[in-house]
């Protein structure tokens, strides 16, 4: 569960290393985001010569959450850290590579480009 002020790792090669959620999109009173949801983030840490720089405000898709994700078959999946992938206004990833596993719940939320770039889908 991601809310305002939550720090997340960046799971792509856009140049950002750490971001902070500043808004959960999808309704005026919406408080939490989970896997596949789009959030607005501020870049808190970035590498030199990356595609983005510290202080930029962008959209991101949440790809990993530490909170349990319950599936229809009764199984539960969870990750060690919260992570997101930066996207542009056309909902395409800014980076060209995705690092680490992503859950298949992204497929239901129509983030097929992220699924295809990911090295492993759980």
Swiss-Prot record:
Family annotation (SUPFAM superfamilies): Ribosomal protein L14
Coiled-coil stretches: none
GO biological processes: translation
Ubl conjugation as UniProt keyword: no
GO molecular function, one term: structural constituent of ribosome
Domain of life where this protein originates: Bacteria
InterPro entries: Ribosomal_uL14, Ribosomal_uL14_bac-type, Ribosomal_uL14_CS, Ribosomal_uL14_sf
Any one Gene Ontology cellular component term annotated for this protein: cytosolic large ribosomal subunit
Assembly and interaction partners: Part of the 50S ribosomal subunit. Forms a cluster with proteins L3 and L19. In the 70S ribosome, L14 and L19 interact and together make contacts with the 16S rRNA in bridges B5 and B8.
Family, per entry: Belongs to the universal ribosomal protein uL14 family.
Functional description taken from the UniProt entry: Binds to 23S rRNA. Forms part of two intersubunit bridges in the 70S ribosome.
Name the record gives this protein: Large ribosomal subunit protein uL14
Species in which this protein is naturally found: Nitrobacter hamburgensis (strain DSM 10229 / NCIMB 13809 / X14)
């Amino acid at each position: 569960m991601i809310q305002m002020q939550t720090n997340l790792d960046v799971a792509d090669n856009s140049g950002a290393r750490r971001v902070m959620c500043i808004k959960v999109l999808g309704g005026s009173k919406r408080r939490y985001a989970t896997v596949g949801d789009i959030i607005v983030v501020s870049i808190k840490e970035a590498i030199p010569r990356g595609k983005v720089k510290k202080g930029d405000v962008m959209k991101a898709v949440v790809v990993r959450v530490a909170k349990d994700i319950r599936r229809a078959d009764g199984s539960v999946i969870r990750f060690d850290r919260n992570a997101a992938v930066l996207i542009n206004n056309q909902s395409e990833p800014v980076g060209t590579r995705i690092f680490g596993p992503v859950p298949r719940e992204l497929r239901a939320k129509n983030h097929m480009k992220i699924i295809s770039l990911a090295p492993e889908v759980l």
